[in-house]
C-alpha cells in the first residue's frame, strides 16, 4: 500500500484526484503501477486501468491470474470490470467510495456470481489514511482562489 500512496501523492501534485494503484504478482513484486491521469485528457486514465495495462505488458499476457491489485480508493464500475476481465485474483482497497465505488458500496461487480470471474476483496485497508488524503486534496482545491495548481504533501 505504501507504493499506492506514493502514486496517489504524485497524482495530487499533478492536480489529479489522489488515487494510486499497483498490481503485484504472486511473489509480491510490483508489476504494474498507475496514478490518476484523467486531467491529461483521457477519461479512461484511472489509476487502476493504468496499473492493469502496465502489468499486462510486463508479463506479456492480459490474464493477470494470481495477482493482487492494491489501490487507495474503492474502484468504480469501469475499473471493477477491468479487474474482472483481467482475472485479478485479489483486490485490496483503502477508502470506500460512496459516490462511485463498485466493489461493495454501490454494487459489487468483482464478486458477482453471474460473471465468469470473481475475486477476493479486502476493503477499508488503511481506510483513514486514504480518506484523509482525499479530503486534504479537496479542501485545498476549494481553498484555491487564484487558480494556481498546488498540492502540499502530507
Task: Show the residue positions of the predicted features.
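Short beta-strand scaffold segments in enzyme catalytic cores
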Residues: 19-28
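Short, basic and Ser/Thr-rich N-terminal targeting/leader segments
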Residues: 15-19, 65
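Zinc-dependent deaminase
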Residues: 1-11, 78, 82-154
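Immediate flanking context of iron-sulfur cluster ligation sites
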Residues: 61-74
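A short, polar/charged loop-to-alpha-helix boundary motif
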Residues: 40-50
Amino acid at each position: 500500500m505504501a507504493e499506492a500512496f506514493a502514486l496517489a501523492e504524485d497524482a495530487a501534485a499533478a492536480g489529479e484526484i489522489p488515487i494510486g494503484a499497483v498490481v503485484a504478482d504472486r511473489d509480491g513484486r510490483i508489476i504494474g503501477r498507475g496514478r490518476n491521469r484523467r486531467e491529461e485528457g483521457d477519461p479512461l486514465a484511472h489509476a487502476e486501468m493504468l496499473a492493469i495495462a502496465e502489468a499486462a505488458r510486463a508479463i506479456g499476457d492480459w490474464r493477470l491470474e494470481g495477482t493482487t491489485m492494491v489501490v487507495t480508493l474503492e474502484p468504480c464500475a469501469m475499473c471493477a470490470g477491468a479487474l474482472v476481465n483481467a482475472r485479478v485474483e485479489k483486490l485490496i482497497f483503502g477508502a470506500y467510495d460512496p459516490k462511485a465505488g463498485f466493489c461493495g458500496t454501490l454494487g459489487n461487480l468483482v464478486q458477482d456470481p453471474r460473471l465468469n470471474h470473481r475475486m477476493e476483496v479486502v476493503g477499508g485497508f488503511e481506510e483513514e489514511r486514504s480518506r484523509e488524503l482525499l479530503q486534504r486534496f479537496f479542501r485545498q482545491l476549494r481553498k484555491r482562489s487564484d487558480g494556481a495548481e498546488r498540492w502540499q504533501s502530507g
